[in-house]
Amino acid sequence: TSYMRKMWPVVERHLAWEKRNFDPDGDHLYDAYCCIWASDALYYSGGAVTHSSAYNYRANRVAAIIADKLGVPSERYHKEADAIKRAMNKGLWLNDGHWAEYRDLMGLQRVHENAALWSVYTPIDCGAGSQQQCYNATRYVDSNIPHLPVRWQSNPLYDRIFDCGADTLYTISTSNWMPYSWS
């Protein structure tokens, strides 16, 4: 725990920085800027973003666990994690059974319902959803994210290894957006 104790002030400052910069309105839904590998083509413009909120949910949940182990106050991190999860369920979870990509900050505050793959796997990986939500979100991938067939010539060796025929392999697109870049 000596390393955790040494690094704890860094964790505290970083989470305060995240909150100050990416949740300035205090709604517990975080904007995303340079947050994932696809960031250079995304323009959330201060909106409430699913994957960024999920990352901050996980960060606060883990910070609370570390604080408890160190014997330092952890309530603020427990509360923020719980508030993020509630806000995600209220503001970003859709009746269709998946998380939205994001909600606009300005104007009509539209909810962008066509989530990309990272807005499915990130909240699942971060533990931000119930088992039912996680299952429903993966069904969204099955029914809404393009599955692009991989064409290959059947080979008995590969057929035994993969237990499939030439028409059953797919790669999954990251989204169903066209054009890819939007704002």
Where do the model's predicted regions map?
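Acidic, glycine-anchored loop motifs typical of Ca2+
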Residues: 3, 28-32
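Active-site core of glycosidic bond-cleaving carbohydrate-active enzymes
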Residues: 5-16, 43, 47-75, 79-82, ...
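Glycine-rich, aromatic-flanked loop segments that form ligand/cofactor-binding clefts
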Residues: 19-23, 29
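Nuclear receptor C-terminal ligand-binding domain
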Residues: 24-25, 56
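Aromatic- and acidic-residue-enriched carbohydrate-binding clefts of CAZyme catalytic domains
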Residues: 31-47
